[in-house]
From Swiss-Prot:
Belongs to the BICDR family. GO terms for biological process: Golgi to secretory granule transport; vesicle transport along microtubule. One of its GO terms (cellular component) is cytoplasm. One of its GO terms (molecular function) is small GTPase binding. This is BICD family-like cargo adapter 2. Residues 64-300, 353-458 form a coiled coil. InterPro entries: Spindly/BICDR_Dynein_Adapter. Residues 135-149 have a biased composition (Basic and acidic residues). It comes from the Eukaryota.
Length: 508
């Protein structure tokens, strides 16, 4: 891949422009070797150039090592962040499970307390009934004793005539006791009216609780709809992943084509290198007074063979036996590597970190809704506890039965709510797992895309080197006739002009 700030492509003899030696920033060694190549500079300066080149290569290697180290540190940091996020998620899940377990234990304890209280109330009712039976038996015994006393009084009327005043006093006392009993009956009637009002208030509270239950059911339905929406978003994420995989396959096919073209270019380069070595051997065997025209014809013939070998990479190049003007007029502009290897046209709109943040926000919203539902459930439990305390103070059996039925209904509702909360938590966990899988897949795709970009850069660099080699060969062929034959050399070893092609082949 290339960027707008990447290396420019200077125009050479093959593209209809000036000589490649005019681009001082792209190939600095051309200016450094111009004098030695043309035979005008002294020879001892070449070791210094080689030392500078070696230092530059060492600097490049150090920079590459530092870059690799930075990439490894960045990978390690991302891995640590992922581990911390997973640990936080596990800790939050354990805390939620522990709170749910504590709520269940509290509910079971409250149910056991209510059952124990109901058993105590039943025991109190049985004790009161026993006391009432004892009082009735005592009243019957007192009635029998009164009848016996009356019989004794009738039999002993004469004897008890002196006690008539005492009997009248006793009658007055009994009258007062009767009035007290009547007052107690009226108080019991008032208490019954109060009980009826309390029952009506409890019925109203029961209706209010039913309305709250309906509200909770509506909230649960809303949660289910949100879960369905989350599943829809997850489905869209899967579709995006499938699209990315399809694009990755297309990019891999393009990469294979580019690699095949690069292999052909390398094979052509090797053939050209062998041809240059052959020409070098021939030049060693030839006489030093060979004319410049014969040497130019041989070099043109070798370049013609190299162009025929690289026909697949540059189909628009013409034979090098033509003059520079003819090449400028006839050779078409070579297609740059950016047109051959296009970058991926579509990228994901959001990075994996942003998608993770969005999913964490959704999970936090779900947790807030669950906490609100738990708070409402706690308030309902408190209201039920208050109702239990109020009903525990009532003695009639009907109130007790109604309290037991309300208790059972409230317990059933609490169990249903706990089951629904468990289902919501399970769905949330499944969504979080799907989210983690999607993030891992996206990270893998991103790494593959980066590797593909690196491969493309390598292929583009190879194509640029091959193109630069052809331009330099053409410039060398055009500048050769103006110099004497003994000063021209294609040697790959040490010498006044042997380092140019050797450095070029060493770079490729």
């Amino acid at each position: 891949m290339s960027s707008p700030d990447g290396p420019s492509f200077p125009s050479g003899p093959l593209s209809g422009g000036a000589s490649p030696s005019g681009d001082e920033g792209f190939f600095p060694f051309v200016l450094e070797r111009r004098d030695s190549f043309l035979g005008g500079g002294p020879g001892p300066e070449e070791p210094e150039d080689l030392a500078l080149q070696l230092q530059q290569k060492e600097k490049d290697l150090l920079l590459a090592a530092e870059l690799g180290k930075m990439l490894l540190e960045r990978n390690e940091e991302l891995r640590r962040q992922l581990e911390t996020l997973s640990a936080q998620h596990l800790e939050r899940e354990e805390r939620l499970q522990q709170e749910n377990h504590e709520l269940r234990r509290g509910l079971a304890a409250r149910g056991a307390e209510w059952e124990a209280r109901a058993v105590e109330l039943e025991g109190d009712v049985e004790a009161l009934r026993a006391q009432l039976g004892e009082q009735r038996s005592e009243q019957q015994d007192s009635g029998r004793e009164r009848a016996r006393a009356l019989s004794e009084l009738s039999e002993q009327n004469l004897r008890l005539s002196q006690q008539l005043a005492q009997a009248s006093q006793t009658e007055q006392e009994l009258q007062r006791e009767l009035d007290a009993l009547r007052g107690q009956c009226q108080a019991q009637a008032l208490a019954g009216a109060e009980l009826r009002t309390r029952l009506e208030s409890l019925q109203g509270e029961n209706q209010m609780l039913q309305s709250r239950r309906q509200d909770l059911e509506a909230q649960i339905r809303g949660l289910r709809e949100e879960v369905e929406k989350g599943e829809g978003r997850l489905q869209t994420t899967h579709e995006e992943l499938l699209l990315l995989r399809r694009e990755r396959r297309e990019h891999s096919l393009e990469l294979e084509r580019a690699r095949s073209e690069a292999g052909e270019a390398l094979s052509a380069l090797r053939r050209l290198q062998r041809r240059v070595s052959e020409l070098e051997e021939e030049s060693r065997l030839q006489d030093a007074d060979v004319s410049a025209a014969s040497l130019q014809s041989e070099l043109a013939h070798s370049l013609d063979d190299g162009d025929q070998g690289q026909g697949a990479d540059a189909p628009g190049d013409t034979p090098t036996t033509r003059s520079p003007k003819t090449r400028k007029a006839s050779s078409p502009q070579p297609s740059p590597p950016e047109e051959i290897l296009e970058p991926p046209k579509k990228r994901t709109s959001l990075s994996p970190a942003e998608i993770l943040e969005e999913k964490e926000v959704e999970v936090a919203k779900l947790q807030d809704e669950i906490s609100l539902q738990q708070a409402e459930l706690q308030s309902l439990r408190e209201e039920l506890q208050r109702q239990k305390e109020l009903r525990a103070q009532e003695d009639p059996g009907e109130a007790l039965h109604s309290a037991l039925s309300d208790r059972d209904e409230a317990v059933n509702k609490a169990l249903e709510l706990s089951l629904q909360l468990n289902r919501v938590s399970l769905e949330r966990d499944s969504l979080s797992r799907e989210l983690l899988r999607a993030i891992r897949q996206k990270v893998a795709l991103t790494q593959e895309l980066e590797a593909w970009q690196d491969d493309m850069q390598v292929v583009i660099g190879q194509q640029l080197r091959s193109q630069r080699q052809k331009e330099l060969s053409a410039s060398a062929s055009s500048s050769t006739p103006r110099r004497a034959a003994p000063r021209f050399s294609l040697r790959l070893g040490p010498g006044p002009a042997g380092g140019f092609l050797s450095n070029l082949f060493r770079r490729t």
